[in-house]
Amino acid sequence: MKTIVIKLSGSLFSMDSGPSGIKKIVKTLDGLARNGVKVVAVAGGGKLARDIQKTARTFHADEALLDQFGIDVSRIHAKLLTTVSNKACPDIPTTLDEVLRYSTSHPIVFSGGLSPGQSTNATAALIAERTKAKLFINTTDVDGVFTSDPRKNKNAKLMKVISTKELLSKVVDDKMSAGTYDLMDLLSIKIIERSKIHTIVIKCDSRQIKSAISESELPMRKLVRKSTGTRILPLS
């Protein structure tokens, strides 16, 4: 049975966007499960986690505790997803071993973060590695990997393909403190690279998830300019 691991952007859980986006994505995942696909979806902490971490910093909380706040929020988000799905395991895993155990008996497992010092991107990449996932989809609040931040530069171009080496060079100077992980952090990229995980970066949207899965079966030479998101090539 094929396994797909999906990192769900924390932006999905913004209270401003309402529940419709969550419902559409969970419906898509339930549909995959009905078609015999195992799904592990890792929820991000998003704005709520960042706001809590920002407040805790004013009280001089250390980075490990800030990470734990982020993990706790992401697990609440994961639990929220279980209330929408009729295919998911009702329990939220707290270790990688629990993720693996739950996925043997349930077609869908929703997870939050697992360990302090590790982004939910890295958590999802580790799960993809351990489950030998056929596909890892990393969803963000933009359409994929761009030449620069598209929220700050209107001339930024979407990159259809990028190697892990190129991606590493883009993030190597990022500050690795709690709540600052954005597209991907160093650990998630190195996991993708070492295990040659088939990875696509897309916007957190149900239609894009469907498109990315269908396009993932296409060889690179058949990809067209309008294909969904960015493919990451695990090249060192």
Predicted regions mapped to residue ranges:
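C-terminal catalytic "cap/lid" subdomain
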Residues: 1-236
